[in-house]
Swiss-Prot record:
Modified residues (N6-acetyllysine): 225, 234, 312
Official protein name in the record: Alanine--glyoxylate aminotransferase
Stored Pfam families: Aminotran_5
Gene Ontology BP, a term: glyoxylate metabolic process
Species for this entry: Pongo abelii (Sumatran orangutan)
InterPro entries in UniProt: Aminotrans_V_dom, Aminotrans_V_PyrdxlP_BS, PyrdxlP-dep_Trfase, PyrdxlP-dep_Trfase_major, PyrdxlP-dep_Trfase_small, SP_NH2Trfase/AEP_transaminase
Species classification: Eukaryota, Metazoa, Chordata, Craniata, Vertebrata
Function field: Peroxisomal aminotransferase that catalyzes the transamination of glyoxylate to glycine and contributes to the glyoxylate detoxification. Also catalyzes the transamination between L-serine and pyruvate and contributes to gluconeogenesis from the L-serine metabolism.
Length: 392
């Protein structure tokens, strides 16, 4: 028998059926799910340490190696968003007092600075205005001056729409005995990245962008150089949950019997497995081409409306997330709200430094189609006609 009376009654809202609006997600992520990926989310759960689950985990690792273009044995999934993957990289590689060089040309570089400082690293931001990118010469100056153990670059800066070139940076870092960490959250699956050939030591991505899986899992891979640094550290990582030695064992990366570490998000991993399977069936190069062609079509339609792309150099435009300069006289919030309220299409404003300056339109995975470009540009045309415009 219960010894106390209930003080909290069943919430009335939970006694009603769950209702989800039918909405087209054309922001920087998450993206709408393909039917096969949605179906995977409805499958029955199995034990996290069963042979069947281990098989699924191994298939996911092979899929990650494919989309990352790597043969690294130390390749796995982090149970958490891409922020978790970034923290996993930093908490395992950096020790207090280590020098950490960060390309801070948007919100994700700023987050890397914040996390590095929390870990007691000596953080050296290379700050750029929104829309900027890094050259080999600029990075070499930072490497020579600060002698870091780790350099962070964002491949696809979704807050600014910049695609950071990666060729040559791995070789440059290794010349200075520095590891290269790359954020590819919004780029993997949507634009070329070659982890091994570009000399990237740690690469991570998210499930909910061009890969089209639900949010909540992140992909990460470590080179042998990165593994050596992590496995020879003098102090334990601050986080047990993100300790790579435990995670490597649980994901079958160390050729040892697997030991329980935490309960993985089983249903989310079903969906991730299917998202990687779809890219494998489509072909990675075909996926890149689809995103490139959809982005080019979007850029042309936007410019036909008289809108200006925020990133001026076409070679530096991220194909998965396009940033559009907010047209003079308009409040970006009015445009975003109009497109949502009248067309059930989600686009987003800026994040971090570009807040108030840009609109962000994502063409990610399943959503990267000419039909969706037509829908969002017609919605923008209507918004520009009906939203209030201040006199300049």
């Amino acid at each position: 028998m219960a010894s106390h009376k209930l003080l909290v009654h069943p919430p009335k809202a939970l006694l009603k059926p769950l209702s989800i609006p039918n909405r087209l997600l054309l922001g920087p992520g998450p993206s709408n799910l393909a039917p096969r990926i949605m179906a995977a989310g409805g499958l029955q759960i199995i034990g996290p340490m069963s042979k069947d689950m281990y098989q699924i985990m191994d298939e996911i690792k092979e899929g990650i190696r494919y989309v990352f273009q790597t043969r690294n044995p130390l390749t796995l999934v982090i149970s958490g968003s891409a922020h978790c993957a970034l923290e996993a990289a930093l908490v395992n590689v950096l020790e207090p007092g280590d020098s950490f060089l960060v390309g801070a040309n948007g919100i994700w570089g700023q987050r890397a600075v914040d996390i590095g400082e929390r870990m007691g690293a000596r953080v050296h931001p290379m700050t750029k205005d929104p829309g900027g990118h890094y050259t080999l010469q600029e990075v070499e100056e930072g490497l020579a001056q600060h002698k870091p153990v780790l350099l962070f670059l964002t491949h696809g800066e979704s807050s600014t729409g910049v695609l950071q070139p990666l060729d040559g940076f791995g070789e440059l870092c290794h010349r200075y005995k520095c590891l290269l960490l790359v954020d590819s959250v919004v780029s993997v699956g949507g634009t070329p990245v070659y982890m091994d050939q570009q000399g990237i030591d740690i690469l991570y991505s998210g499930s909910q962008k061009a890969l089209n899986a639900p949010p909540g899992t992140s992909l990460i891979s470590f080179s042998d150089k990165a593994k050596k640094k992590m496995y020879s550290r003098k102090t334990k990582p601050f986080s047990f949950y993100l300790d790579i030695k435990w995670l490597a064992n649980f994901w079958g990366c160390d050729d040892q019997p697997r030991m329980y570490h935490h309960t993985i998000p089983i249903i989310s991993l079903y969906s991730l497995r299917e998202s990687l399977a779809l890219i494998a069936e489509q072909g990675l190069e075909n996926s890149w081409r689809k995103h490139r062609e959809a982005a080019a079509y979007l850029h042309g339609r936007l410019q036909a409306l008289g809108l200006q792309l925020f990133v001026k150099d076409p070679a530096l435009r991220l194909p998965t997330v396009t940033t559009v300069a907010v047209p003079a006289g308009y409040d970006w919030r009015d445009i975003v709200s109009y497109v949502m309220d009248h067309f059930d299409i989600e686009i987003m404003g800026g994040l971090g430094p570009p807040t108030g300056k840009v609109l962000r339109i994502g063409l990610l995975g399943y959503n990267a189609t000419h039909e969706n470009v037509d829908r969002v540009t017609e919605a923008l045309r209507a918004a520009l006609q009906h939203c209030p415009k201040k006199k300049l």
